[in-house]
Amino acid sequence: MINMRSILTYSLAILGLICFLSVFFESNNPQIIFSAILIGMMGFFRINPLIYQKISFLNDFKLDLCISLSAAFFIIKEISSDFGQTLWFLSICAWLHSWLAVEKLMSKESKIFPLVYSFGIPILFGFWLLFFWEVITVGLKIPTVILPPPSMIAIKFMSSLDILFADFQQTFMKSVLAGYFIGCSSAFIFAVLIDKNDFLRRGLLPVGNFISALPIVGIAPIMVMWFGFDWQSKAAVVVVMTFFPMLVNTLSGLNSSSLIERDLLNTYAASYWQTLFKLRLPAAMPFIFNALKINSTLALIGAIVAEFFGTPIVGIGFRISTEVGRMNLDMVWAEITVAAIAGSVSYGALSLIERLVTAWHPSYRLKNN
């Protein structure tokens, strides 16, 4: 049976030899020639299993990783010149070498592997995503108004840190955090009240469902008229967007405990609040954290979209809308990068807290086995 590692090995052998042959017809750069020859030799060794099995270091994942990253570095340096077939073949070979290194690493039993799996592989994947973004946009000469390369975005990002930080403060630190806290906490309180009172369940759930179906582009202008052009109106939009997901997930979590567990507490004459804090809330924690993680991204999206409908001359949404009109796409992508980093950090922080709080829960233990 052919596995993924075998497919990668044979693909690298073929592409490496093609890269080795094509370099003599196109490139004059010694670094590119060296990379192509090295990858071509590795391809020859992979075709010849006797050599490949006898030389042990050829099967080491660190060698494949070093080859891939070195080739990527040389390609980035050469990318501004004429981008021929050799660089395309070399780019694909470098990526496959990195993939093969990950496959080799996953086959090893190591104490550091969980750490590498959690951080190293996502970082490596992100690196190659940015690498091919750069290669495709520059190599195919795509206009920057359509898609700027990551290098151009990085330069704009570093030269506009003061503007980006001011926009981050306005959108995230004020609108998102305030709306997120109010929306999630109020939804949690209402979920407990609805769980205790059947009348509220029948009355509030349909209303919450109706509000959640309202389009954000319809809510945002109304909130601006009610609360003004500053961050308060954007926080109100975030409250509306985060309320219903938190409410539904909390209610589902409160009902996730089994009937046998509740009957056991009833036999000890436990009150409603004792059952809630001793059994039902701990059992609901995975559901609550799911809602918190979902809302961490919804809140940011809601605040940014709300800023399109009226805001002071600061904010991520305001900056995106104005810079698009000026065709400054590098600044638009820099703002998108800020939003992506803020959302990812928020989601990651909540995931870490969830791991600490729900480490005892069966769902967490099953997920990690």
Regions found by a protein language model. Give the residues of each.
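Membrane-topology segments of multi-pass transport proteins
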Residues: M1-S118
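Periplasmic/extracellular loop-to-transmembrane helix junction in inner-membrane transport proteins
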Residues: F24-P30, E78-F83, V138-I182
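C-terminal transmembrane helix and the adjacent membrane-cytosol boundary/short C-terminal tail
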Residues: M42-Y52, D198, N255, N290, ...
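Transmembrane-helix boundary motif in ABC transporter permease subunits
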Residues: S107, A178-G208
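Short cytoplasmic-facing helical segments at TM-TM junctions of multi-pass membrane proteins
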Residues: G203, N249-I288, G317-I320
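Generic hydrophobic transmembrane alpha-helix motif, especially the helices
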Residues: G208-P245, S252-G253
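Glycine-rich helix-loop "coupling/hinge" segments at transmembrane-helix boundaries
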Residues: M225, G253-L254, I301-V338, Y364-N368
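Transmembrane alpha-helices
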Residues: A236-V240, Q274-A306
